[in-house]
Amino acid sequence: MDEKVFIRGIERFDAAEFADALLSAGPEETRALRARLGPDAFERMRERAAEARMRSGARGNVVVLHGIMGGELTEYETDAQPRAVWLKLLRILCGGFSLLPLAGGASVRRIAATGILKRYYGELLLSLMAQGWNTHAYWFDWRLDVRESARTLALRIRE
């Protein structure tokens, strides 16, 4: 198993997929999740995922929006593997801010929002599910005009 690819996939999962991944993780996946989330948080999230699986019927819909520190941004180059540029602290400390500028409201590089960081939002997503809410994570490029992100969110809610 390629741990980086596995974790990258986890960050892109919606709440239900994340719950399923926690409950069906084999030994290697469990080790990677414990390392990424922290052992105590991993156990709490796994418990919430089990509680959510036991629930039937939703109380309603909830959309979780991340803050500036909770969304993942990934750079896509035509000849290279995608690479996370936000939030990777080491990359930021080594000049990663240079990858983030916008020009005329658009990204200078091919960067897209690719996930909501489960380390920060996983417990919230799973706790809402365990309480019976139909829970969805919405990730967006926080660098762009908030009005455009709101329009995109409104379209997604209507789907």
Give the ranges of each region predicted by the language model.
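N-terminal non-catalytic accessory region
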Residues: 1-159
